Amino acid sequence: MPMNPALALQEAMLARLRDDAALTNMLGGQKVFGRPPRRTAPPYVVFGDPETRAWNTFTETGHEHRLTLHVYSEHGGRKQAYEIIARLDELLDDAPLPLTDHHLVNLRCVFWTALRAADGRLFHGILRLRATTHPLQ
């Protein structure tokens, strides 16, 4: 059974981010997570819940994905959050990521911001991406 395209995309993105020495240095270690960590000190990056829609036609099948990466920064504040977002953008925008059982047609960063979190001590950076995939034949 082929891998779910959203999971294949998240796996490839996670591998790309974890393999980058500059991002690892910015985060102070391997702090890119598929789900929110417990008791991990900021800064760190967490994948949000993906949204996937079919874009099938009479001749082709495929999916559109909307993904969100969350960046949490404390002492470095908004500046640190934006620096991490900029690195994520460099690594992911139009990246030729290899996917299991699927082909990545495109991957684009479409929105980013950094806001003071409700607790007043953290900054919450948000990076949204859009991707399209189709299954390998």
Identify the meaning behind each predicted range.
Residues G28, A41-P43, H63-L67, H103-V105, ...:
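A generic structural signal for short beta-strands and their flanking turns/coil linkers
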Residues M1-T57, A95-T100:
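Small/polar-rich, solvent-exposed N-terminal microdomains that initiate assembly or binding
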Residues E90-Q137:
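Acidic-leaning, charged glycine-interspersed low-complexity segments
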Residues T61-H75, F123-H134:
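Oligomerization/assembly interface segments of phage tail-like spikes and tubes
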